[in-house]
Amino acid sequence: MRAIGLMSGTSLDGIDVALIESDGETVRVRRGHNGRIGPLGPTGYRAYSDEDRALLRRALAEAEAIAVRTDRPGCLREAEERVTRLHAEAVENFLTENGLTPADIDLIGFHGQTVIHRPGQGLTVQIGDGARLSRHLGIPVVSDFRQADVAAGGQGAPLVPIFHRALARASGFEGSLAILNIGGVANVTLIAGNGDLLAFDTGPGNALIDDWMSERASRPFDARGSTAAAGRPDEALLAWLLVHPYFTRRPPKSLDRNSFSHRLVGPLSTEDGAATLTAFTVRAVARALDFASEPPRRWIVAGGGARNDEMLRLLRHHLRAEVTPADEIGWSSAFLEAQAFAHLAVRAWNGLPITFPSTTGVSAPMTGGVTARP
C-alpha cells in the first residue's frame, strides 16, 4: 500500500509528512547503484507559525484539566480544529508538490497532537479529527493509535519499534542495534541479535531545551547545540535530576512531555542551563543500557537530536559505542516517525498488532487505531 504518515511531535515545530510503500510486515527500501539506501519516498514539512505554536502551548497547559479523554476544556476545541485543518493543508501541499492526487494514496496515518499522556490513569489524548480529515481529503485515515493500548493497561508508547525493526531488516542490519529517537521526549528501540524488541521512553528529549531557549533566548531551539556547547552542566543538579524514580523503573515505561520542567534549571545562565538540560537528556539515554539484554553494537539517532552536534558528542562519550545520525546511513532523521505512522496505519488497516508486551507493557500483542473512510 502507498501510505502517508503525519507526525506532529511534542517539540511543537510543525507537521512532518512522509510517503512510503508497506504491506504492514515489510517496508520497501530503494538502493542506489552504489548499494546505498535511498529515501523510502518523498517527504514534506509544514512549519507551525508562532501563533499556531502559542495556541498549542496553551492547549498543553489547559489539557491538565482533562478528566476523561473526550473533554476539551479551554482552548482545546479550537486547537483540535486548527490541528486538523493544518494537517489537511500539509497533505494537500505535499500531493501538489509531488504531482500526486488523492487517488494515488491508499491510506493516511494521522498521529495528531499529544496534549496529555498519563497511562497510569488510563488517559492519553491526541487532538485531531481523523474522520474530518478523511472526509476533507477523500482518503481513508487511521488515527487515535494509542488509546486501545492504554485502555488495555499498556503505556501507549512507544509505538514506532515495530517499524524500526522492519526498516532495520529491510536495510540489512544484523546484530544488536539501538535506534534512538530524540524528539520532545526521547525513546529507544533495542533490537537484540535474535530480533527481540525492547522499547521505552528514556527521558526528556528536546522539549526542555526548546522551552528553555524559548524563554531565555526567544529562540525555538538550540541550533546545533551551540548554546549548550558554550556552557557547563551543573553536576550537582544533574545528579539530583537523575535520582528521579523513573530512571530505575524497569521498562516498558513512558513519559508525558510535561513530566519534567525546564524551570528546574532556572537559576543558571542561559548557556549553563542549556548544557545541563542537554546532559540530562544524554545521561538518561545512557541509563537505558541498564535494561539492555546485550550492549548495542551501534546506535542510530533520529529526530531533532540527530542535528544537535553537542548532543551527539555527549552520546558518543557516554555510550562508548558507534553513534550514527540516521541520515548518514540513508534513513531520514527528520521523517522517521512520520514514516513509522504510515507503516503503523497499514498494520492497523490489516488488523496486525502495533503494540507488544516488550514495547508498551500491554498483556498481549494488539492492534489499534481508529479507521475513518471518506
UniProtKB/Swiss-Prot annotation:
Supply the HAMAP family for this chain: AnhMurNAc_kinase
Which SUPFAM superfamilies does this one have? Actin-like ATPase domain (SSF53067)
Which protein family is it in? Answer: Belongs to the anhydro-N-acetylmuramic acid kinase family.
Gene name of this polypeptide = anmK
Reactions catalysed, semicolon-separated, are: 1,6-anhydro-N-acetyl-beta-muramate + ATP + H2O = N-acetyl-D-muramate 6-phosphate + ADP + H(+)
List, alphabetically, the Pfam families matched.
Answer: AnmK (PF03702)
* Role this protein plays: Catalyzes the specific phosphorylation of 1,6-anhydro-N-acetylmuramic acid (anhMurNAc) with the simultaneous cleavage of the 1,6-anhydro ring, generating MurNAc-6-P. Is required for the utilization of anhMurNAc either imported from the medium or derived from its own cell wall murein, and thus plays a role in cell wall recycling.
The alphabetized UniProt keywords are: ATP-binding, Carbohydrate metabolism, Kinase, Nucleotide-binding, Transferase
- Ranges in a coiled coil: none
What's the name of the protein?
Answer: Anhydro-N-acetylmuramic acid kinase
Instruction: From the UniProt annotation, give the residues forming the signal peptide.
Output: none
Keyword Cytoplasm appears in the UniProt entry: no
